[in-house]
Amino acid sequence: MNLNSIPAFDDNYIWVLNDEAGRCLIVDPGDAEPVLNAITANNWQPEAIFLTHHHHDHVGGVKELVEKFPQIVVYGPQETQDKGTTQVVKDGETAFVLGHEFSVITTPGHTLGHICYFSKPYLFCGDTLFSGGCGRLFEGTALQMYQSLKKLSALPDDTLVCCAHEYTLSNMKFALSIFPHDLSINDYYRKVKELRAKNQITLPVILKNERQINVFLRTEDIDLINGINEETLLQQPEERFAWLRSKKDRF
């Protein structure tokens, strides 16, 4: 399968997987127009849509795409049932698309019903995990998001993390404020800065590398523990995650 990214709005990415026959899967189409343009340019035949959560910048293009291609099956969590979903899926279930099984992983935090889709090596994680960061807590709790990230971090090393937003540069600036002397973070920040200066995408990322540079995946890191404890005593990793998320919100 071939992985494609379609820019939308200011910083969204709509991901598309296509097979050799031209059949395609569309993930979180917040806007129909760029997707329709890509379908025409590549002669794709849409088979399915995956929705991760109910926010408009992830579901706004569904209605128009389904009107144009009524054969499309729209998979999504319960919270997207009124956004065009025709097949509600939940944790532990699978969606069989393009000849591949995609596992559904529930990841509450950004929204209460947020889900991700995984078929090795592809992880479509919506607004749960970003490169260098994680989603804001609009509906869920810090504990829920911490547990969701633990699930995703446990996936295979070679997982390709397909995030829904180009937030990497700002996330890495925050990471540097936490770990100013970390070699991996400094190296990745320089790489990302160069890519964005050329208006190039920083995604997808390999999960093995992401674990090294994403402070939200490093809540049990001794350097982080020592650094945080200079300000406040936090004994549990989920407490350190909540502290980081709150600090990032104000960054």
From Swiss-Prot:
Function recorded in the entry: Thiolesterase that catalyzes the hydrolysis of S-D-lactoyl-glutathione to form glutathione and D-lactic acid.
Cofactor note: Binds 2 Zn(2+) ions per subunit.
Residues at which Zn(2+) 1 binds: 53, 55, 110, 127
Entry cofactors: Zn(2+)
Protein name: Hydroxyacylglutathione hydrolase
NCBIfam families found in the cross-reference section: GSH_gloB, PRK10241.1
Binding site for Zn(2+) 2: 57-58, 127, 165
UniProt KW Signal keyword: no
Subunit relationships: Monomer.
Family: Belongs to the metallo-beta-lactamase superfamily. Glyoxalase II family.
